[in-house]
Amino acid sequence: MKKLFFALVIFSPFNLFSQDRITGEMFSTRSEVISQNGMVATSHPLASQIGIDILQNGGNAIDAAIAANAALGLMEPTGNGIGGDLFAIVWIEKEKKLYGLNASGRSPENLTLEYFKENNFKSIPAYGPLPVSVPGCVDGWFELHNKFGKISMADILSPTIKYAEDGFPVSELVSYYMKVAS
């Protein structure tokens, strides 16, 4: 019995490393995730679930992306939100066509290149009100939805509105930034 125990102790560690790894690496890696009917991946599980629910309820990938992005603006306001910009690249397989959207903020209507020249600016200042643009995110959602959306914007945004009204668990990351900011 003592010899058997010794043999198990000696050979067990080698057995851990002797398995073939598809990646070719000798350490654990993340598993591949595959799906037959669509997938949503975000940095927040509730936002991902909202996107999945949109797909399951008849929405398409654009609808799910808008819904997940709206949820991230609520649930992770440190990195997302309606006060930012939106950029999208959309491939429509049936058309074999690629679409792009630049929904970055525009300057206020009266803030023109001529204004900067007349006031002797050689470049746009880094600080103050002049470098601020009008957020383009929400307009981007509606541009994408008008071109590619399948279900109503009310249905797309209602899960996030419900979380905004009823509350949701705050993630560790957001909690940290709230603490630092207070």
What does each model-found stretch correspond to?
Residues I52-D53:
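Surface-exposed charged/polar residues within alpha-helices that form helix-capping/stabilizing sites
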Residues Q19-Q49, A61-I62, I66-S182:
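Noncatalytic scaffold domains of N-terminal-nucleophile
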Residues M1-D20:
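Bacterial Sec-dependent N-terminal signal peptides
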